[in-house]
């Protein structure tokens, strides 16, 4: 569902899927082909939130406080992305937390359950793991391609949901 807040309503691009029980609130922009899955919350109630093209915000994830999400990004189930910048072609693993001022550069993976502390910047092609999160190694070309493939699979899945989902 989309909600206006303080006179600001979400801006939604073409071919966007928003699950019925997801909440997209206030000053939010969703790029073409993006998807917001069941139970997710994108709260643009205090600052603008940007979600790029063909990005997916998976079940029960939360975006808040000026988060900027690039193109082709996967934000995994139950992740929290707060006041940070996630560049293009990044996978934020399930249950991970990325805090204010952090920057995750393109072609990177933040592993499941990682805690990215505030104001940390990570270089491109990083495998970022742990609590607190650190770079463990550079990603391979195959791993980078798998990030792209995951985002594309969610674009396809969102199209299927838009065509075939029936509310009972």
Predicted regions, residues:
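Short acidic/polar alpha-helix capping motifs at helix-coil junctions
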Residues: 1-2, 20
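C-terminal segments of enzyme domains that contribute to small-molecule binding surfaces
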Residues: 2-8, 71-75, 79-80, 97, ...
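A structural motif detector for beta-strand N-caps
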Residues: 10, 14-18, 22, 28, ...
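Conserved protein kinase catalytic core
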Residues: 117-118, 136
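Conserved catalytic-core motifs of eukaryotic protein kinase domains, centered on the activation segment
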Residues: 120-121, 139
């Amino acid at each position: 569902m989309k909600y206006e807040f303080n006179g600001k309503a979400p801006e939604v691009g073409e071919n966007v899927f928003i699950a019925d029980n997801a909440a997209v609130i206030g000053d939010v922009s969703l790029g073409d082909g993006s998807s917001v899955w069941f139970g997710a919350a994108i709260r643009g109630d205090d600052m603008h939130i940007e979600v790029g093209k063909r990005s997916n915000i998976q079940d029960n994830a939360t975006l808040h406080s000026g988060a900027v999400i690039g193109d082709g990004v996967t934000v995994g189930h139950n992740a929290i992305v707060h006041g940070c910048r996630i560049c293009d072609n990044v996978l934020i693993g399930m249950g991970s937390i990325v805090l204010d001022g952090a920057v995750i550069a393109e072609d990177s993976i933040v592993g499941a359950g990682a805690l990215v502390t505030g104001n940390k910047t990570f270089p491109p092609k990083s495998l970022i793991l742990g609590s607190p999160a650190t770079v463990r190694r550079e990603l391979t070309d195959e791993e980078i391609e798998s990030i792209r493939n995951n985002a594309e699979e969610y674009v396809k899945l969102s199209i299927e949901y838009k065509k075939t989902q029936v509310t009972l």
